[in-house]
Swiss-Prot record:
Pfam families, sorted: MFS_1
Domain of life: Bacteria
Membrane topology listed for this record: Multi-pass membrane protein
Source species: Salmonella paratyphi A (strain AKU_12601)
UniProt function note: Catalyzes the proton-dependent transport of sialic acid.
Record field: catalytic activity: N-acetylneuraminate(in) + H(+)(in) = N-acetylneuraminate(out) + H(+)(out)
Protein's name in the database: Sialic acid transporter NanT
Keyword field: Cell inner membrane, Cell membrane, Membrane, Sugar transport, Transmembrane, Transmembrane helix, Transport
UniProt cross-references to InterPro entries, sorted A to Z: MFS (IPR011701), MFS_dom (IPR020846), MFS_trans_sf (IPR036259), SA_transporter (IPR004742)
Cellular component, GO annotation: plasma membrane
NCBIfam families, per database record: 2A0112, PRK03893.1
GO MF term set: carboxylic acid transmembrane transporter activity; sialic acid:proton symporter activity
């Protein structure tokens, strides 16, 4: 940018169409967060009415994780072939239909299937909305686009909690799911009133349709085997998270089977760039493993170890959720200022200073605990707002929506594993110590993976002929594309 351009406030670099595109996607992501957390809010009511066991009730939450990876792949491929806008609208309709179906569910099986649909729609919304906004904004503002967008999910969760307190006591739990009709109306408005993403339009103008991830996996020469592996992965995930398996060896074996299948899909769809894709799945996996123990078990910690009443728990959780939402926006500014990877590492390092005090302070001062959680979540959880920008930069426009959707949602299985890890460690330690130690140690793994740019580094080690030296979204160089100690002159931009 020129000096005169740099002196202009960042928001004036955006025209009305770009703001409209962002606002629409942000509202879609808010609705996504709203719909996703509804089941957690009414789980006890659903369990009581349907006469479910604790395992069956918990499986209604896990169901969304079982289907997310396939939704990210399928709807991401739709976004790569037909445009980001159509994929985003389709995703909103899908998770809204699933939410509405939960309201009409006569029993466990119907609600479980509806939750599978919600998981697919949620995954598609993540990949399509993120690529839509990022590709619609100027290159030097794309970390802000990513961070601001992801903040919508946290806001949606806060809105859901407030709506729950107003609706359920008066009209019952089903009425909460009937609100799912509203996003469908919003999606129909989106279809007519928002433009297509600029990067996608430029890439596809006057060209033949691209060969998507779905084409490669399910229409290629290995389609039969891939279909069988898809069913095998779905069945394995169901047995792991909803099948009440007691044998740890069997669960580990099924988890290994899923890992092999997902890596196989990445190798087939990414060709020579498969090392980058596999490492990105690991980055996301560990990002969920360090953050979700706190996300999932913090309410339990506050109620059991600190003996807080429900009102106090709600206040503390507000600080935590609001901190994450603010952190997404702060992460956007940091990313555009320092660069995506450097901002990520600096924010996580700062969050490490706070994680021990959060669980060491005890419950004597609620406000101090709330403030510590606010800043810890702002720095540790909120920085994940720029994760779509980080992942998307490793994929070309033709494969970005499916690549981002599949990679992120496979790694998101860490969100289902994280509470289990926290609970297992808590059998030997108190819950606060378990959460602090797990988050503290695994955050360092993410710092190393991102700070050393391991996706590019492993690509250079294993398949250097397909190495990309620059970010496909903002053209910034990848530090892992050259050996450590090499100067800036070592970066020679490769054709994407």
């Amino acid at each position: 940018m020129s000096t005169s351009t740099q002196n202009i406030p960042w928001y004036r670099h955006l025209n009305r169409a770009q703001w409209r595109a962002f606002s629409a996607a942000w509202l879609g992501y808010l609705l996504d967060g709203f719909d996703f957390v509804l089941i957690a809010l009414v789980l006890t009511e659903v369990q009581s009415e349907f006469g479910l066991t604790t395992v069956q009730a918990a499986s209604l939450i896990s169901a969304a994780f079982i289907s997310r990876w396939f939704g990210g792949l399928l709807l991401g491929a739709m976004g790569d072939r037909y445009g980001r806008r159509l994929a985003m609208v389709s995703s909103i309709i899908l998770f809204s239909v699933g939410t509405l179906a939960c309201g009409f569910a006569p029993g466990y099986t119907t609600m479980f299937i509806a939750r599978l649909v919600i998981g697919m729609g949620m995954a598609g919304e993540y990949g399509s909305s993120a690529t839509y906004v990022i590709e619609s904004w100027p290159k030097h503002l794309r970390n802000k686009a990513s961070g601001f967008l992801i903040s919508g999910f946290s806001v949606g969760a806060v809105v859901a909690a407030q709506v729950y307190s107003l609706v359920v006591p008066v009209w019952g739990w089903r009425a909460l799911f009937f609100i799912g009709i509203l996003p469908i109306i919003f999606a129909l408005w989106l279809r007519k009133n928002i433009p297509e993403a600029e990067d996608w339009k430029e890439k596809h103008a006057g060209k033949a349709p691209v060969r998507t991830m779905v084409d490669i996996l399910y229409r290629g020469e290995h389609r039969i085997i891939n279909m069988l592996m898809t069913f095998a992965a779905a069945a394995a995930l169901w047995f792991c998270f909803a099948g009440n398996l007691q044998n740890a060896a069997i669960v580990a074996g099924l988890g290994l089977l899923c890992a092999v299948i997902f890596i196989s899909f990445m190798v087939q769809s990414s060709g020579k760039r498969w090392p980058t894709g596999v490492m990105l799945m690991l980055v996301v996996l560990f990002a969920f493993l360090y953050s979700w123990p706190i996300q999932a078990l913090l309410p339990t910690y506050l109620k059991t170890e600190l003996a807080y009443d429900p009102h106090t728990v709600a206040n503390v959780l507000f600080f935590s959720g609001f901190g994450a939402a603010v952190g997404c926006c702060v992460g956007g500014f940091l990313g555009d200022w320092l660069g995506t990877r450097k901002a990520y590492v600096c924010s996580l390092l700062a969050s490490q200073i706070l994680i021990i005090p959060v669980f060491a302070i005890g419950g004597t001062n609620v406000w101090v605990l709330g403030l510590l959680l606010f800043f810890q979540q702002m720095l540790g959880q909120g920085i994940a707002g720029i994760l779509p920008k980080l992942i998307g930069g490793y994929f070309d426009t033709d494969q970005r929506a499916a690549g981002l959707g599949f990679t992120y949602n496979v790694g998101a299985l860490g969100g289902a594993l994280a509470p289990i890890l926290g609970a297992l460690i808590a059998q030997r330690l108190d819950l606060g110590t378990a959460l602090a130690s797990l988050s503290f140690s695994l955050t360092f793994v993410v710092i190393l993976l991102i700070g050393l740019d391991m996706p590019s580094r492993v690509q250079r080690w294993l398949r250097p002929e397909a190495l990309r030296t620059h970010d496909a979204i903002d053209d910034k160089p990848f530090s892992g594309a050259v050996p450590l100690g090499s100067g800036k002159g070592a970066f020679v931009k490769t054709k994407s």
